[in-house]
Amino acid sequence: MGRGMQKQRFCLDTSAFTEPSVRKALGVKTVTELTDKVMDLIAEARIKLNISCHIPYPTVYNELMGFLENENCPRDVIVKVDTWLVKKTPNRYEIKIPSEIFYEYVKDLRERINKGMRIGEEHIIKATDMVYELSKKHPEMGKNEIINKVLSKTINTFRNKYRSALRVGTLDSAPDLDVLLLAKELDAAVVASDGGIEKWAQRLGLRFVDASDFPFMLEEYLKHNDRHLRIKY
């Protein structure tokens, strides 16, 4: 067992097992295949280096299970997840978060809500103008036809802009928050590919590891551990 690694802990978000760039780098196509490979690395790192990997339960764990079940994941991969990932519910009543962090989050959320409202207003005005212009140019078109034509052009743009304003770069779900709380409780590094989780992990002074780097980090740890053992013996 490697020394100096006893305190290495990681708290994993669902994206640690679903990140497309990691699948491509490891030569796998599905979430199941990536989970299988990552779990093998986690198991080896646990045995050789005492590195422990944790997953918030039930929120993030259930998210991961949902992805795996959708792919009809084999039972042996589920067993690996249940064996090598430490499932734990964050102690939400005992974890202390500075009030300044809470203030920043509420301020950020308020700004996003206001931005979302402006985007909604802009698209309502735009849609109204389009309906007016279409009804003038094509008086033969029926009401429903005009509405459907306008919505098909504006709804996707609105959704993308609204989603970006409200969700990108912030915490927008209970699982996201649980990853940070559990990492804070355990003094663990956060593993994710979510910009919001990364941003607030930095605010909380937590170590952050991008999900796309995590498997290769474990491989590097294990490679140097094996080299050390060869030199030693």
From Swiss-Prot:
GO terms for molecular function: ribonuclease P activity. One of its GO terms (biological process) is tRNA 5'-leader removal. Keywords: Endonuclease, Hydrolase, Nuclease, tRNA processing. InterPro entries: RNA_free_RNase_P. Pfam families: PIN_5. Its EC number is 3.1.26.5. It catalyses: Endonucleolytic cleavage of RNA, removing 5'-extranucleotides from tRNA precursor. RNA-free RNase P that catalyzes the removal of the 5'-leader sequence from pre-tRNA to produce the mature 5'-terminus. Belongs to the HARP family. This is RNA-free ribonuclease P.
